[in-house]
Structures are given as structure tokens and as C-alpha cells.
Regions:
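Metal-dependent phosphodiesterase/nuclease catalytic metal-binding core
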Residues: 95-284
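His/Asp/Glu-rich metal-coordinating catalytic cores
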Residues: 2-12, 16-23, 27, 33-171, ...
Length: 284
């Protein structure tokens, strides 16, 4: 039987299968390369882009343990048939469909996004008997503005800040969110500086058919009229003596009234790589 339990990842005890285990396992399926879904497994199944991201984040020794599986292909693990389907979350992100010889099926949808994105494959939703899904924005108040409105808000913030002689600094997670932001800035023909972690991951996007714009390496000593894109985790590295600047946090949590004060930024912009409440309902 496919009866899932949560034990630091999704576990199917009747067949011994781990998905997105956060501690190393002999074998696991990895839905995508965000750090809260990966570990240094002895062997793991993932899409080729996810394995390439893991190579950058965890090293070549870990990546070599990866078994690449393209979307919609089948991998047999003991008696189980495993398939991966695009989750729309970030490049290479996958939903995991597991089927037993008797035809019983389970779909594990880790992190996913239902809206079309600029830096990820569009979502595909297969049928299954049992669904296990995320609910990051699972409350009715989480209704995002139209994507075009959010994109325009990002561009307006950057242009207004530059016109005021200041440096716009966009805080965006280095895998997924940052790349979508870069595509938005590229379409607006804005000059970009990006942190080295973002630039390294950009190479994987380009290798897998999503070219990223040219960016200058982030140099706090030379911020001349550039839009800076960097992960929020390194915010403390911003020198105190850089030119006047404004900070924007790019996150779906921007919908919360307290977000700007919690993130201590000048503004918050609700671009998310997770499905909102209505997207979760649509998925079901």
C-alpha cells in the first residue's frame, strides 16, 4: 500500500521509498534542488537540471550519485514505477508519481507553481489515487496580483530608484526566484549586477535551454547605475558605506501586512514560485 508518512521528508513505509528526505538515505527521490529538499544521499533520482544544481551546491561527489530521469519517463525501483512531471516551481523541479504493480498510484507534489513562469517548465498535473501536496500559501487571503502587475512593480521600483540616484537592491532566493527576476529586468533593458551564487546557477539554466541575461559580478565598490540582485541570506555582507540604496524583498510573503517590517526593507514585492490559495484549489 502507498501510505505516506512525514519523517523529515515523505516516506512510504510499505515500500521503503523516501522523497525529499532532509537527511542522507541509501536512496531517495529529490523533487528539486532547494536545500530543504536535498541531502547527501548515497543514491538519488532526479531530473538532469536538478542533478546539475546539486553539483554546484553540494559538489561533484554527491552529484555523481544522481540517477537522471527525464520528465514522463519511467524508473523501476523494486516493484514500483516512478515518473517525474514538471512542477513549475524552478527549473528541473518535479512532482513524483509512484505506481504499484496492482495499479495503485500516489502523486507527491512538493513545491509547485501553477502560473506560467519565465524560468521554469510549465506544470503538468497527472492523475493519481492519492495526492500529497504542499500548502505554503494555503489560506484564502493569499491571492497574488496578476503576474504582469508584479513584474511592472519590480521594474518601476528599479527605475524610480535609479532616477533618484540610488541603487536598487533586490533580495531574491538564488535558485529560481533570482532567475525569474533577471528575465524581468532583461525585458526592461535594465543593467544588472548579480551575486556569484546566482551567476553560477545561471549557467545551468543556459545549458538546459533557458538563456539568462548577461550580468556583471556583484562589486559593492562599483555600483554605478546598476540593479543589484542578491540572495537575502547574504544581506549582512552589504557594506555600511555603499552609495544610497533601497532594498526590496521579492517574496510571496509580501502579501502579509507585516512583511516590510519583518524583512526590514523599503518595499516588498509578491513574486512567488509557489502556488497561491486559488492555485492550490485548481491543482486539486
Amino acid at each position: 500500500m502507498l501510505t505516506p508518512v512525514e519523517r523529515g521528508g515523505l516516506y512510504l513505509p510499505d515500500c521503503g521509498l523516501w522523497m525529499d528526505a532532509r537527511r542522507p538515505k541509501p536512496f531517495a527521490v529529490v523533487s528539486h534542488a532547494h536545500s530543504d529538499h536535498t541531502a547527501r544521499h548515497e543514491s538519488f533520482l532526479a531530473t538532469p537540471p536538478t542533478i546539475d544544481f546539486i553539483r554546484i551546491r553540494l559538489g561533484d561527489a554527491v552529484a555523481r550519485r544522481g540517477i537522471p530521469l527525464n520528465y514522463r519517463e519511467t524508473y523501476q525501483h523494486g516493484p514500483l514505477n516512478i515518473q517525474l512531471y514538471p512542477a513549475g516551481h524552478v527549473l528541473g523541479s518535479a512532482m513524483v508519481r509512484v505506481e504499484t504493480p496492482s495499479g495503485e498510484s500516489l502523486l507527491y507534489a512538493g513545491d509547485f507553481k501553477t502560473r506560467p513562469g519565465l524560468a521554469a517548465e510549465p506544470i503538468e498535473i497527472p492523475q493519481a489515487d492519492t495526492l500529497v501536496m504542499e500548502s505554503t500559501f494555503g489560506r484564502p487571503e493569499f491571492v497574488f496580483p496578476p503576474t504582469e502587475t508584479i513584474q511592472a512593480g519590480i521594474v518601476s521600483f528599479c527605475r524610480e530608484t535609479l532616477n533618484d540616484g540610488q541603487v536598487p537592491i533586490l533580495l531574491a532566493y538564488s535558485l529560481g526566484k533570482a532567475q525569474e527576476v533577471l528575465k524581468i529586468l532583461e525585458a526592461a533593458e535594465l543593467p544588472i549586477m548579480a551575486h556569484r551564487t546566482i551567476r553560477a546557477l545561471n549557467q545551468v539554466y543556459t545549458q538546459h535551454g533557458i538563456p539568462m541575461p548577461e550580468t556583471r559580478p556583484l562589486d559593492f565598490g562599483n555600483l554605478d547605475a546598476q540593479v543589484v540582485v542578491m540572495p537575502p541570506t547574504i544581506r549582512k555582507q552589504i557594506p555600511a558605506d555603499i552609495p544610497p540604496h533601497r532594498l526590496a524583498m521579492i517574496s510571496g510573503w509580501a502579501l502579509q501586512e507585516s512583511a516590510r517590517y519583518r524583512y526590514r526593507t523599503d518595499t516588498v514585492l509578491p513574486l512567488s514560485d509557489h502556488a497561491p490559495f486559488l492555485g492550490l484549489r485548481y491543482f486539486i
